[in-house]
Amino acid sequence: MFKSRLGIALLMAAALPAGVHADNTIEKGDTSRVYDIDEVVIIDQPKEAFRLRQQPLSSTSFNGAQLQSLNVQDVRQLSAFVPSFAMPEYGSRYTSSIYMRGIGSRVYSPAVGIYVDGMPVLCRSAFNFHVYDVDRVDVLHGPQGTLYGMNTEGGLMRLYSRSPFQYQGTDVKFSLGTGFLRKVEASHYERLNDRTAFSLAGFYGGQNGFFRNQFDGGRADLINEFGGKGRLLWHPTGRLAFDFMADYQYTRQNGFPYGQLVTEDEIAAAPITSPLYGLKAGTQSPDQNRQSNYRRNILNTGAGIKYTGNGFDVNSMTSWQYLHDYMLMDIDYRPQDFLHLIQRQHGNILSEELSVKSRNGSRWHWTFGAFGSYQWLKTSAPVYFDKDMNAFLSKTITDYAYNGILNSMARGIAQGMIAGGMSKEAAEAAARALAAANIARTGGVNIDMAMDPVPGLFRTPTFNLGVYHESNIDLTPHLTATLGLRYDYSHVAIDYETSARVALQEHVFGVNISPVITSRLNRHEYDHFNQLLPKVGLTYRLPDGSNVYATWSKGYRAGGYNFEMFSDVLQTETSKAAKAARADLDIAHDEAYYERIAKTIEYKPETSWNYEAGTHLNLLDNQLHLDLSAYYMQIRNQQLSVMAGNYGFGRVMTNAGRSHSCGLEATLRGGALDNRLAYAISYGLTSARFDEYTDSVAGGGTIDYKDKQVPFVPQHTLGASADYRIDVDPAALLDPSSRFHLRSVTVGMNLSALGKIYWDEQNTVSQNFYAVLGAHADADFGPLHINLWVRNLTDTKYDTFAVQSAATGKRYTFAQQGNPFQLGVDFRLHF
């Protein structure tokens, strides 16, 4: 199987038309040159004074051709090609987990910010979107809080669309692939005159997927989505420019194809009657009695204004973002009918940013700015306790009541037997047998417990305000100092309304009672946070555009409130009350109880101090670019996503006291053979460990996670790509004058590798280092390109995500497998 798939890649390189020539000799006059992306794809930056590789930070950039070569359809597929960056493909479009430099989050406050055409994407549930019509992607590593505010502690990603002022015409792209991948994209760019230009684009994408739900045979990762966007650029004068944009996307998919992760020890210990008997160790196929699914509408709109003054630029960006989604999740991930969740989100976000930047040739380059945003988010998230869960709860409370009665009766009987001369051991055994017989004779003990769905309505408004300044001062012709400071204020609140109802049917000693237990929680909580986010850097410029730098900065992620764990709180509370209930009971909650709830659901802001040194080197007369950086981060109150409470009905954010992250990053980009060969290698080493973090466990004990690796963070990332263009001799063509004659063929391969990744705080479950190989061959027919591509050429088996759950009363580990071998073809037409 491996040889046959490797053969596909070799055929891509070998199956070239006659007359193709490739001169592999390196001539003395090789004209190869690697350019900074700022020199090729020019974007007006409203805040920065210098190009990316001239700033005191580590960064990675991709142009449109590089994104096409890597076949990037969303930002998750840049994982490993950016050092220390991982955004795993799992769950659904709802999932937006990004990990960079040892920090990240599966829920609530993100660690990496995203901007699209200068507009911030502020809704976490909208981070994972279809990428198309993109001309450039920048990834800035490390805290970017001074200029970009909270939730950019790990870094920042900026995406830029093609400008209709620079690019005109119509593009149509059609793709087919295994797993019945199908996709159509169409874009039109038109420059009406020197002052006005616009673009329109739309897409449809779908895939039947690779995994089936063993419960019903349905496709567990089916997806269909479509969308459209438009952009209008208007420059009424030489000083004033307007940029209006809107982007809508709709997604409907089956999601969360998690299968049980089974170890070799579990299989070896399984009896022949166990469902584990005879299985192969590893992650099994999904087997859920309900097919989890997700639907989402997102609309992002922005209005940018730029005024060019005498020696300064003023930029304004106003945005409105809308989210409306629906999620059904089988949260026990089992074929049994225990639990499921239905969640609906309805959100609106308004934001405004105003910045003023110097534009002159002086030694002082300055930026001032202010940012404000307000988010309204309403979430309805009822949790349904299904028949197997109610059966489990009924057995639990029945066993509790039966054993309590049995032990009480047996103690009294045993005392009499011991007084009559019987040994203690014999008396206790005889007493328990006699007590059990008496219980059975008088009607026994049986309690049926039915827990109604737990509704939950949560409103979580958020207000954020920031004011900032950054100066870059040329101390000498070679040395520049960077000084920045931001004041950031955030106000967070939660209004929650939730309740629980448990109906009991108690049959004890022939007496039947039917108590009903209810509990209601309704409260408003709020908090606010202030932070100063400084930045200090030094950049020393070397010849040929190279430089070395050092920087010190502070990172910040906002605090807030959990709400996914209320069903766990209410279930625990009502189950405890049910053990003593003899009549209807409405559980009362006093002020002290609500204060304890507030402490339970809140999580604190995360802060970090980042120390970094690095260099940007232009080597071999700009045939090679080498970027190196080393960093150390001291993290306080690191935010972690864990499963809630006793049963793990939802994910919650908690804080680890202290942790640290350190690492190395390297990126090498080069060109050779008169730019016919382009290659890139990136590597990231991350060591992220807890310094202070303890957690309570059942029975009142604690567990210490000191020196454990922070979960979900890959210790190594490795990305590599190489593309070789083979030009076609026109003399070898039948009709070289044809508009569609073959110009060149580009063959390439790429590799993305990550690991080791721990999936839990105790570091008991992990994914070893793995590598995924890709290949492509692109034929250039002028207006038409045909690209044959392969992903996961060697069909590597790996997990992209794993989670532990005790929703069924026993702790299991569930994981999602990475996509297997996939073959596809793209047709791109420009006219």
Regions inferred by a protein language model and the residue ranges of each:
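C-terminal beta-signal and adjacent terminal beta-strands/loops
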Residues: L377, Y556, R676, F740, ...
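Outer-membrane beta-barrel translocator/receptor signature
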Residues: S96, P110, C123, Y132-D135, ...
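Periplasmic-side early beta-strands and strand-to-turn transitions of outer-membrane beta-barrels
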Residues: Q166-Y167, S175, R191-Q288, L323-F338, ...
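Membrane-embedded beta-barrel scaffold of Gram-negative outer-membrane proteins
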Residues: G304-S319, L323-M329, N547-Y549, E564, ...
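Gram-negative outer-membrane beta-barrel transporters
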Residues: K357, T367, F371-S373, P477, ...
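Solvent-exposed loop segments that connect transmembrane elements
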Residues: F211-G218, F256-S285, D332-L339, P382-P455, ...
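Extracytoplasmic beta-strand/coil segments of soluble accessory domains associated
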Residues: S59, R76-M119
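N-terminal periplasmic "start-of-domain" segments of outer-membrane beta-barrel proteins
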Residues: G29, V34-Q68, T95-S97, F165
